[in-house]
């Protein structure tokens, strides 16, 4: 019996490593420019009398390195829901009504773009991983997206709620395991984030909440992951070489979020950038030891841009050249911090800028790369990537 069982297990598994086969992104149409945002935010929350706090918020926005963000919440929606604009008003029902509907809708746009780039019928999707920080409901956003896209009822679904900013790495780790352990699997991975649950008015006694109001934006990203790609019809973008998760030492309470009647509250300690930069070298050494890589300027970088201070301190700690974090900084500038969706936007940015610059590979001409997710815990996801040659590149 044992040999037959081994043969069955072998047949169930893919032969090669998982790869990203397509990427799609989407944002709400409502763009908010960071230079104008303090005036807008204090006006819409009826907080213009807090002049000193407004000046602090302006400085936060100026230092954020963000040019614009996209938000589902328009001025009209906020005027219709004044409790969302308060700091401590019961408003969870109104917030839930928005995100339960809009998170899957935004996800559908990104997923449709990824499926179109992939070029295969959606009936070939075997698994769906859906991640969002907001809008817990039953049946969940994974079910709603299955219905919106018209996926097969037998698609195997996984739903991740309220993981936070590290979860763009989590979904890649799960997708890798699914693709490599199920021959022929094609995994649709979607992160969809809408700030309607975290938006709230300012408070002089809670400046950490104000930091979140200066950074977060809305966006959805989708990827298709599979092993053993069809060389005639599928074009891999990146291979997923390894994936790991760790909780950083002495970091408990550094980033917290709590779902309450007033919405999803956000708490942030000042030393988050320091905690990440202090521990990132060990994460890299553990991940790249099997490859014999220890020059962090010889790899391409996709780092979750929680804020500019995190990127700055990582850059200094590791002695990275300025261009190493350019893709991460550009996504932060153009979209803000979109929580779990951010690293997938950066993955898209990386392959596009590599092609436009005539680079030899999808990873800025380099072979190996790293994707980092940072978030509550402090939790770090470390994904080792391998780029692929760009067709027609010199």
Curated annotation (Swiss-Prot):
Keywords: Acyltransferase, Flavonoid biosynthesis, Transferase
GO biological process, one term: flavonoid biosynthetic process
PROSITE patterns: CHALCONE_SYNTH
Record protein name field: Chalcone synthase 8
Enzyme class: transferase
E.C. number(s) listed in UniProt: 2.3.1.74
Catalytic activity from the UniProt record: (E)-4-coumaroyl-CoA + 3 malonyl-CoA + 3 H(+) = 2',4,4',6'-tetrahydroxychalcone + 3 CO2 + 4 CoA
Database matches in InterPro entries: Chalcone/stilbene_synt_C (IPR012328), Chalcone/stilbene_synt_N (IPR001099), Chalcone/stilbene_synthase_AS (IPR018088), Polyketide_synthase_type-III (IPR011141), Thiolase-like (IPR016039)
Family assignment from sequence similarity: Belongs to the thiolase-like superfamily. Chalcone/stilbene synthases family.
Superkingdom of origin organism: Eukaryota
Disulfide bridge positions per record: none
Gene behind the chain: CHS8
Function: The primary product of this enzyme is 4,2',4',6'-tetrahydroxychalcone (also termed naringenin-chalcone or chalcone) which can under specific conditions spontaneously isomerize into naringenin.
Molecular-function GO terms, alphabetical: naringenin-chalcone synthase activity
PANTHER family in UniProt: CHALCONE SYNTHASE, HYDROXYMETHYLGLUTARYL-COA SYNTHASE
Active site residues of this protein: 165
Coiled coil: none
Pathway info: Secondary metabolite biosynthesis; flavonoid biosynthesis
